[in-house]
Amino acid sequence: MSSATLEKLLGLFDRREQRTLPPIIRGDTRAERMELRENLRIALESLESSGMFEQRDSTGKTLVDSLLRLAEETLWDPFAREPGRTRIFFELVFNVFDPKRINQGLKGTCAAACIEGYLAERDPAEYSRIVAGLVTREGLVTMKSGQMLVCNEDVLAPHEREQRRNAVSRIFQAACMEFAYPNMPYDNVVDGHFHGDDNVGSGLEINAFERLLQAITGQTWKTITVMHSRLAKQFASFGVETRDVVHIGRDGVAIIDQAARQNEQVFVTLELPSMPNPIPHAEPPVLYNMPHKVRALRVDWTNRVVHYDDPMDPDRRWFDGAEMTLHDSFGHCSMPIDDFSRLMTEMSYRPEFFTREADQQAPAQPRTE
């Protein structure tokens, strides 16, 4: 039997949806909207029965408090008209119910999408609080770090490069991109940061990513890069002791393995050797040495592969220079350990989950410089 809270949420959704003109999705029918409502009920019932409704965010409020806030409070002006509230509500519920659906579309927001997926999986109450804050009233929210995340995204209409990225993910990721570079506004439509009138491109460099990651999670993360390893190697050539320096080539796979054994994930930048430009008719047709952020999930020593979540959610192999296997349509991929280790250029991990002396099932393969 459904609880009073669940029925209240569905009731609020019903009242909103009856006034949704035009339909939520162009061309949808009443039957399709009823199917959407039933899927929403299933998702809400699952969240309630699993106890997720009562999970608390960093302010002590529950996940259901954020859902009710989103359903009842005044929205930030650009989202106030229907189908804004209806669409945002069910997209948030589905993102929490099934975080695997979170992706970057064809935008250069792989880093922000990785953080969004991580937060929705690991701290759904905090994720819901942040989304509710971004879309209600002033369009801003205080993160765990005490810093403000601000929503400047003012359009819910889909863009061709959104692909399967939903409206909530677009709002969240655009706000993250804006925060990561406080002195360079981000434009979601053209997918770029602006320095004055100059579009300097999309994506996040490692310092910007680290700033965003620590602000969102409230945790301390350690970042290592190929450059750190090269400097350590150079110092070692002058007789400086560098054995205690964490080396991404030597230790990277071990870090992923130890983190996974303690139910933690690692953020990794892979430098993809070459790839067809994913944007139709865009120039150049082939891109080379492109950085791409993924979440490393675990190491399978038996099959000698690293499992990872690709925020592109590819439906086919989309880059060259390494073997990769797709396990589903939601970004679960795997890559041979040797290839993954060779492509790693940056890694952000929780330092308390890695110890050099820890017993390893198998050693990581050193990078060949």
Regions found by a protein language model. Give the residues of each.
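Short, aromatic- and cysteine-enriched interfacial helices/patches
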Residues: 5, 12-13, 52-53, 212, ...
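Active-site cradle of extracellular carbohydrate-active enzymes
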Residues: 193-232
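Active-site signature of cysteine proteases
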Residues: 4-10, 25, 221-369
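Hydrophobic, Leu/Ile/Phe/Ala-enriched alpha-helical segments that form helix-helix packing faces
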Residues: 114, 118, 213, 231-235
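Active-site nucleophile-adjacent alpha helix/oxyanion-hole segment immediately C-terminal to the catalytic cysteine
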Residues: 8-18, 22-42, 51, 58-199, ...
